[in-house]
């Protein structure tokens, strides 16, 4: 085991996680974690390992994955960990990487030192660090299926997320027998930095966060461990308080992109169904990525009397999006607040858009901010979370016919044109492709039956499906389902009635 620890220390030195002076300290700490009396650390062996380390192995995370697997095998054999479930192993190998992860104060000092030269240099450092210390598990991320599909709005991004660990049924059963916890209050709380974890809360010994001020309020910046797109970051409030879309949010989004102009930042909506999975803690998501919606041009331009100095338009997109931009940040915030206030109380019964049911509000906005040179830009995606008898999960939500592919909420990431699809689809779509090739009836298959209508449509549409083309065809059709999902979520549809309805709303802003 000494040799494996020396290889891990070589990795730590090579990546800059630790320095030469930390070697013996880390070696002893790791030996203590693994409960064995070590021989003296062989520093010559470490030097040799550093020479042999291949850049591509480091960058893919493969070298680290192999070392951690050896450590986990040892821990299991010695009874240090009780089983080989993903949850148990993740709790332990995160403790291991915590030994190689510097204290928060040092990481923050390094970040701001780099920031003083260049915000981009600072984020590149922090993103690389978050990968090197295994907070972002690159060897899992690369398992995700990612591809693009053509649409009338440009390319859409499709991902089938395989890197998020599946919940272990045995561990779920155990949870019912364990005491409930209130610390940390949620996975976004600042108190999760360095937290040791438990069955229902991932270990965070290698987790580091960077303080940022947004409109004078204290926030923290981190990367998502699941990286749905390049440099996928999360910016969360220092207090555990609910999401709320208001004029202050627009100011916070712009405050961030002013400080990090190479990143966008957006917020999920603040209502159930159209919001994200965490409404209890104010947070935003951003990153260094151009989404399909950002690349899409304007379908129509318009002006508002109150804001002659700003540009406005309707984005050519399946959802209902107003884009505004201008040089004056405060004017952009005022315009966005004005549109939000008007939309909160706006109804159009002819299009089934009702602002309230009794005292329950339905209208809100998903905002996304960017900096384009001197211009501040904001996309305002109009959302409504009404439910009906026919659509009990949401009228402007994926309709039931698409649930075989996507039934979860359409949050910020999907709104912008990136489908995050469940892991079950990897196997299901592969098996569906085989069934189509073999002309199998799947109507009574307990797993594939949900895809029956989808498969029939594919069979009708494509005459000559071969082993070489079936995967590409199924993937393209999944992309079309995602497009339909986005259309369902749009409140002003793309037919003439919908376009006229959108124009009526714009006219109401004058």
Regions found by a protein language model. Name each.
Residues 1-242, 316-318, 332-336, 342-510:
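Active-site microenvironments that recognize anionic phosphate/pyrophosphate groups
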Residues 61, 230, 262-264, 277-279, ...:
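Coil-to-beta-strand transition motifs
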Residues 206-208, 238-265:
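Helical scaffold of the NTase/Pol beta-like nucleotidyltransferase catalytic core
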Residues 219-224, 249, 253-257, 303-310:
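Structured alpha-helical segments in the cores of large, soluble enzyme domains
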Residues 252-256, 338, 481:
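Amphipathic alpha-helical segments that form well-ordered structural scaffolds
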Residues 257-277, 286-338, 344-347:
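Catalytic or ion-translocation cores adjacent to nucleophile or general acid/base/metal-coordination motifs
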Residues 272-280, 358-364:
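Beta-rich nucleic-acid/ligand-interaction surfaces
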């Amino acid at each position: 085991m000494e040799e494996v620890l020396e290889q891990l220390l070589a990795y730590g030195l090579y990546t800059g996680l630790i320095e030469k002076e930390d070697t013996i300290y880390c070696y002893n700490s790791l030996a203590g974690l693994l409960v064995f009396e070590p021989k003296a650390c062989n520093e010559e062996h470490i030097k040799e390992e550093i020479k042999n380390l291949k850049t591509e192995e480091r960058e893919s995370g493969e070298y680290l994955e192999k070392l951690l697997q050896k450590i986990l095998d040892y821990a299991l054999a010695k009874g240090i960990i009780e089983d080989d479930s993903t949850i148990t192993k993740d709790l332990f190998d995160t403790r291991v990487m915590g030994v190689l992860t510097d204290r928060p104060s040092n990481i923050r000092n390094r970040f701001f030192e780099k920031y003083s030269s260049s915000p981009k240099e600072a984020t590149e450092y922090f993103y690389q660090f978050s990968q090197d210390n295994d907070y972002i598990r690159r060897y899992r991320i690369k398992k995700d299926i990612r591809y693009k599909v053509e649409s009338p709005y440009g390319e859409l991004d499709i991902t089938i997320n395989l890197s998020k660990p599946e919940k272990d049924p045995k561990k779920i059963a155990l949870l019912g027998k364990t005491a409930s916890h209130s610390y940390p209050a949620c996975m976004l709380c600042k108190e999760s930095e360095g937290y040791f974890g438990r069955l229902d809360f991932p270990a965070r010994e290698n987790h580091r966060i960077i303080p940022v001020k947004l409109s004078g309020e204290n926030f923290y910046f981190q990367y998502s461990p699941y990286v749905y797109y390049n440099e996928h970051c999360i910016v969360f409030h220092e207090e555990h308080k609910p999401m709320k879309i208001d004029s202050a949010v627009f100011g916070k989004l712009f405050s961030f992109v002013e400080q990090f102009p190479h990143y966008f930042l957006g917020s999920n909506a603040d209502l159930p169904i159209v919001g994200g999975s965490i409404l209890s803690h104010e947070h935003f998501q951003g990153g260094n990525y151009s989404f399909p919606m950002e690349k899409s041009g304007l379908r129509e331009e318009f002006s508002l009397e109150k804001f002659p100095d700003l540009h406005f338009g309707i984005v050519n997109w399946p959802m209902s999006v107003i884009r505004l931009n201008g040089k004056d940040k405060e004017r952009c915030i005022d315009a966005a607040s004005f549109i939000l206030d008007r939309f909160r109380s706006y109804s159009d019964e002819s299009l089934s858009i009702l602002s309230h049911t009794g005292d329950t509000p339905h209208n809100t906005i998903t905002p996304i901010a960017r900096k384009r040179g001197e211009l501040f830009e904001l996309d305002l995606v109009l959302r409504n979370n009404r439910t009906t008898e026919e659509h009990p999960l949401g009228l402007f939500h994926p309709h039931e016919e698409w649930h075989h592919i996507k039934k979860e909420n359409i949050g910020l990431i999907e709104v912008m044109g990136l489908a995050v699809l469940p892991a079950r689809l990897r196997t299901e779509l592969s098996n569906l492709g085989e069934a189509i090739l073999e002309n199998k009836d799947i109507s009574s298959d307990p797993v594939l039956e949900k895809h029956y209508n989808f498969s029939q449509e594919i069979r009708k549409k494509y005459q000559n499906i071969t082993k070489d083309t079936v995967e590409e065809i199924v993937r393209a059709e999944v992309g079309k389902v995602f497009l339909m999902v986005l259309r369902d979520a749009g409140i002003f549809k793309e037919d003439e009635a919908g376009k006229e309805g959108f124009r009526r709303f714009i006219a109401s802003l004058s």
